[in-house]
Amino acid sequence: MKVLGIDPGSRYCGYAIVEKINNKNQLIEAGLIKIKPNDLQYQITELCEGLDLIFKNHQFDEVAIEDIFFAYNPKTVLKLAQFRGALSLKILQMHGEFAEYTPLQVKKTVTGKAKATKEQVAFMVKRLLGISKDIKPLDITDAIAVALTHSANLRVKK
C-alpha cells in the first residue's frame, strides 16, 4: 500500500511517499515543491506542475493532505486557501479522492500528543521509519507524518 502525504504551504509544499510492506512503513521518496515568490497565478502553476511530476513518476493507492492551519493574517489564510483549492483539484484530476487530516490529528497519531512541536514530529518520524540522519526542512517531515497518519488510519478502518 503506497500513500502520498502532502503538507501544503505558500513557499514549500512537502511531499512524501510511504509504502507499507509486511505491516512496516518504508519511506520511498520525500521532497519539496518549491514555490518562488511571484504572482499568485504563477505560484499556483508551479505547485500544479510539481504535483504533475510526482503523479507521473509514481503510482499511489492513497493520497492524504494536511488541512491548512489557522493563521492570524487574513491574507495568509486566503493565499493558503487558494493553494489548497488548486491542490485539491489537481489531486482529484490525477488520482481521485483523498483524505484530509488536521495538524492536531497528525501530531497526535505520530507523537501521541496533539500539541507536539514540529521538532518532536520530526524526531518521531525518523524513529518510526528507522532513519538516522536529519530530514530537512520540516515541511518534508510534516508530509511524511501525514502519510504515516493515513497509513495508520487505513489499518484501523480495515
Swiss-Prot record:
Pfam families to which the protein is assigned, alphabetical: RuvC
Co-factor remark: Binds 2 Mg(2+) ion per subunit.
Catalytic activity: Endonucleolytic cleavage at a junction such as a reciprocal single-stranded crossover between two homologous DNA duplexes (Holliday junction)
Keyword terms, alphabetized: Cytoplasm, DNA damage, DNA recombination, DNA repair, DNA-binding, Endonuclease, Hydrolase, Magnesium, Metal-binding, Nuclease
Top-level lineage group: Bacteria
Cofactor(s) needed: Mg(2+)
A GO term, aspect molecular function: magnesium ion binding
Gene3D superfamilies tied to this protein: Ribonuclease H-like superfamily/Ribonuclease H (3.30.420.10)
CDD domains: RuvC
A GO CC term assigned to this protein in UniProt: cytoplasm
Main location (coarse class): cytoplasm
Protein residues bound to Mg(2+) 2: 66
Enzyme Commission code(s) on record: 3.1.21.10
Binding locations of Mg(2+) 1: 7, 139
Active site per UniProt: 7, 66, 139
InterPro entries registered for this protein in UniProt: RNaseH-like_sf, RNaseH_sf, X-over_junc_endoDNase_Mg_BS, X-over_junc_endoDNase_RuvC
Subcellular location: Cytoplasm
Top-level class of the enzyme under EC nomenclature: hydrolase
Biological processes per GO annotation: DNA recombination; DNA repair
Quaternary structure (record): Homodimer which binds Holliday junction (HJ) DNA. The HJ becomes 2-fold symmetrical on binding to RuvC with unstacked arms; it has a different conformation from HJ DNA in complex with RuvA. In the full resolvosome a probable DNA-RuvA(4)-RuvB(12)-RuvC(2) complex forms which resolves the HJ.
Family membership: Belongs to the RuvC family.
Cited function: The RuvA-RuvB-RuvC complex processes Holliday junction (HJ) DNA during genetic recombination and DNA repair. Endonuclease that resolves HJ intermediates. Cleaves cruciform DNA by making single-stranded nicks across the HJ at symmetrical positions within the homologous arms, yielding a 5'-phosphate and a 3'-hydroxyl group; requires a central core of homology in the junction. The consensus cleavage sequence is 5'-(A/T)TT(C/G)-3'. Cleavage occurs on the 3'-side of the TT dinucleotide at the point of strand exchange.
Record protein name field: Crossover junction endodeoxyribonuclease RuvC
